[in-house]
Curated annotation (Swiss-Prot):
Name of the protein in question: Cathepsin K
Catalytic activity of the protein: Broad proteolytic activity. With small-molecule substrates and inhibitors, the major determinant of specificity is P2, which is preferably Leu, Met > Phe, and not Arg
Cellular component annotations (GO), alphabetically ordered: apical plasma membrane; external side of plasma membrane; extracellular space; lysosome; nucleoplasm
SUPFAM superfamilies in the cross-refs: Cysteine proteinases (SSF54001)
Lineage: Eukaryota, Metazoa, Chordata, Craniata, Vertebrata
Source species of the chain: Mus musculus (Mouse)
Length: 329
C-alpha cells in the first residue's frame, strides 16, 4: 500500500503543475511566432484556444502512433486560432454563381501511353518558394500564380515568381482579399495581356488599387482548361502531362490546420464543401498510401515546410478534383 502511494506521488505532483509547464511552452510559442496581443484579456482568450488545440494535437498523435491515422499533427503559427477563424481569414475560394463548364474549356486527357507512378515538380524546378497569404482571402491568387509559374517554366525554361498581388488588386470579377476563383484569374491574365512578376508587384496582403505595369509583364496566358469533376485519373494525367495544377479543397478541419507530415486523410473532410485553393505539384505513394503533393500558401511554418501529402484515389478526398484547372500558355 505504501509502495502504491509512493508511486502515485509523482503523478499527483505532475497533475497539479500543468499550468506552469504550459506557461513555458506558451511563452516559447509566442516568441517563436512573434505573437503580440492588444490586451491581457485578448491574450488569455487566445491562450485558451491554443491550449485546446495543443491537447487535440497530442491526442491525435497518440492515435497516430497506434496506427489509427496515416499522418501527424504539430503546433504551428495558427495555434491561437480556431478552425472557423482560419477558414474565415486564411482561405478565400469564392465560386462564381454563374460558373458552368464548357466543352471549350474542358480538359480531355490523352489516355494513350503510361504516366509515371510518381512525379514531383519541385525537383524539376517548376515550383517557386512557399509564400504566406496572411489574413487575406487570397488563396486563389497564390494557386493561380503557382500554376502560371509552372507553365512559364515549361515554356521558357526559366522559373520566375509571379505576382499574386497583381491578381488581388486587378481581377475585378473576383473580390481581392474577400475571395476569388482561379479560372477568373486566368481569364484576367489572358484579357489583360499579362501578369507582373512578384519583384515588380510585391505582395502586401490587403486590397490596393490596381498597379499593373505592362513593362514589368512576366507571363501571358492563352486561356485555361478544367479537369473533369471527380476524376482523379484525369487529374493524375494532367499533373503528369501538363504540370502543377490549381485545385480547391476543404480546409475547415483542425486536422488540416495543424497537419505536419504523412498522408492526410480525414473522413470528415467535406468533398462537397470546398473553401480553399492550393496547388498540386506532384503525386506519389508513401508507405502504401497514394497521395497528391500540395503546395499551400500559409507559409513554411505550416505542414511540411509549407507542403502536404493529401490522400489520392480515396473517393475524391477533400474535394480535390471538384474545381481543378490549369492555364494555357
Amino acid at each position: 500500500m505504501w509502495v502504491f502511494k509512493f508511486l502515485l506521488l509523482p503523478m499527483v505532483s505532475f497533475a497539479l503543475s500543468p499550468e506552469e509547464m504550459l506557461d513555458t511552452q506558451w511563452e516559447l510559442w509566442k516568441k517563436t511566432h512573434q505573437k503580440q496581443y492588444n490586451s491581457k484579456v485578448d491574450e488569455i482568450s487566445r491562450r485558451l484556444i491554443w491550449e485546446k488545440n495543443l491537447k487535440q494535437i497530442s491526442a491525435h498523435n497518440l492515435e497516430a502512433s497506434l496506427g489509427v491515422h496515416t499522418y501527424e499533427l504539430a503546433m504551428n503559427h495558427l495555434g491561437d486560432m480556431t478552425s472557423e477563424e482560419v477558414v474565415q481569414k486564411m482561405t478565400g475560394l469564392r465560386i462564381p454563381p454563374s460558373r458552368s463548364y464548357s466543352n471549350d474549356t474542358l480538359y480531355t486527357p490523352e489516355w494513350e501511353g503510361r504516366v509515371p507512378d510518381s512525379i514531383d515538380y519541385r525537383k524539376k524546378g517548376y515550383v517557386t518558394p512557399v509564400k504566406n497569404q496572411g489574413q487575406c482571402g487570397s488563396c486563389w491568387a497564390f494557386s493561380s500564380a503557382g500554376a502560371l509559374e509552372g507553365q512559364l517554366k515549361k515554356k521558357t525554361g526559366k522559373l520566375l515568381a509571379l505576382s499574386p498581388q497583381n491578381l488581388v488588386d486587378c481581377v475585378t470579377e473576383n473580390y481581392g482579399c474577400g475571395g476569388g476563383y482561379m479560372t477568373t484569374a486566368f481569364q484576367y491574365v489572358q484579357q489583360n495581356g499579362g501578369i507582373d512578376s512578384e519583384d515588380a508587384y510585391p505582395y502586401v496582403g490587403q486590397d490596393e488599387s490596381c498597379m499593373y505595369n505592362a513593362t514589368a509583364k512576366a507571363a501571358k496566358c492563352r486561356g485555361y482548361r478544367e479537369i473533369p469533376v471527380g476524376n482523379e485519373k484525369a487529374l493524375k494525367r494532367a499533373v503528369a502531362r501538363v504540370g502543377p495544377i490549381s485545385v480547391s479543397i476543404d480546409a475547415s478541419l483542425a486536422s488540416f490546420q495543424f497537419y505536419s507530415r504523412g498522408v492526410y486523410y480525414d473522413e470528415n473532410c467535406d468533398r462537397d464543401n470546398v473553401n480553399h485553393a492550393v496547388l498540386v505539384v506532384g503525386y506519389g505513394t508513401q508507405k502504401g498510401s497514394k497521395h497528391w503533393i500540395i503546395k499551400n500558401s500559409w507559409g513554411e511554418s505550416w505542414g511540411n515546410k509549407g507542403y502536404a501529402l493529401l490522400a489520392r484515389n480515396k473517393n475524391n478526398a477533400c474535394g480535390i478534383t471538384n474545381m481543378a484547372s490549369f492555364p494555357k500558355m
